């Protein structure tokens, strides 16, 4: 399903103006810590869902997709079941680097299974204002009527503008409005870590 004609979403740090200085403040998670966190989260999801029979993961492009795939792989190691993984592509319209304009639009979906009656878990890398998640949930309910929709994020950085809460969180980080949580994954970035950076005018 596609809304058509919209540019793909880019990470905030990819849209940094050339005159803006970025200062790395520290590493939040190493590659090993990311792997351990995803293993823990996989166990938490299976336990809370009462198994994997009606469970499916929906990764939000871009970095939510490899995270969802890794969690599904960890679940396969828990009970030997192949948990299906779908993809949602959300376009964000930004009016500056720190605030998202009122529009967050579902651009496309790649979900090859029915969602009716399913226990769905949305997976994203960073939870910030909540606008992306709201658009993702709207898109899911356009596809059908899942039994339950939960949210799993690697990092919750606060500053919510929507009444959105993650049920499964890798790590909660207190941030300022000028700071950016930068997630890098080997499938996309050829390196693996989570950093906290600050932008200076």
Residue locations for each model-derived region?
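PRPP-associated nucleotide enzymes
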Residues: 1-201
């Amino acid at each position: 399903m596609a809304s058509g004609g919209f540019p793909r979403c880019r990470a905030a740090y990819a849209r940094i103006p050339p005159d803006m200085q970025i200062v790395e403040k520290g590493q939040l998670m190493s590659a090993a810590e990311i792997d351990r966190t995803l293993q823990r989260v996989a166990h938490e999801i299976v336990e809370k869902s009462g198994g994997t029979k009606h469970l499916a993961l929906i990764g939000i492009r871009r970095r939510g997709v490899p995270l969802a795939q890794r969690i599904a792989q960890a679940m396969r190691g828990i009970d030997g079941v192949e948990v299906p993984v779908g993809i949602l592509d959300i376009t964000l319209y930004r009016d500056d680097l720190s605030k998202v304009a009122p529009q967050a639009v579902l651009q496309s979906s790649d979900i090859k299974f029915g969602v009716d009656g399913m226990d769905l878990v949305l997976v994203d890398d960073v939870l910030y204002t909540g606008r992306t998640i709201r658009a993702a949930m709207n898109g899911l309910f356009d596809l059908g009527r899942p039994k339950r929709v939960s949210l799993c994020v690697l990092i919750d950085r606060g500053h919510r503008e929507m009444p959105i809460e993650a049920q499964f969180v890798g790590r909660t980080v207190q941030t300022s409005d000028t700071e950016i949580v930068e997630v890098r994954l080997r499938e996309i970035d050829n390196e693996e870590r989570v950093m906290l950076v600050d932008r200076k005018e």
